[in-house]
Amino acid sequence: KVATQTRDTNDAKISPKASVTISPKTGLKDRYVVKYTWKSRGFVWWNCTWYVAQNKTVTWRGNANTWIRNAKAAWEKTGSTPVVGAIVQFSWEWYNRYYGHVGIVAGIENGNIIVKDMNYRWLYEVTIRKVPINSSTIDGYIYVD
């Protein structure tokens, strides 16, 4: 299966694990069609869980709000300390109350974690943003490759 997304070239942020084809779209010199050939890996395409599973070794399933519990059941290390590369699980604030939200810790600076995630603001959008380390929305972390 191939998913297609059209974005300005300045907005395209592509995982190094993705197989990507970029070609000019007829009549629009500054726009491109980006075809992602990532695999579903058992998650719904373009959800936060799907995005994280494309970039980390995820051997469990479930909605984002069950990931820490499910990772523990799969004998993965979990905890409350942020580490670059860890998966971070969030509960309600701006996040979907029923499904939860997950992202990847891309950095730690000045009392914040830098989170890389998908669908935080808009559907299909990858964001990089700061979240205070002591935010009550952070449920914890999963430490996997």
Predicted features and spans:
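N-terminal secretion targeting segments of exported proteins
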Residues: K1-S19, V144-D145
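Compositionally biased, intrinsically disordered low-complexity regions enriched in proline and serine
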Residues: T6, V33, V52, I142-V144
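Secreted/periplasmic proteins that engage bacterial cell-wall peptidoglycan
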Residues: S15-M118
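Aromatic- and glycine-rich peptidoglycan recognition patches
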Residues: I108-D145
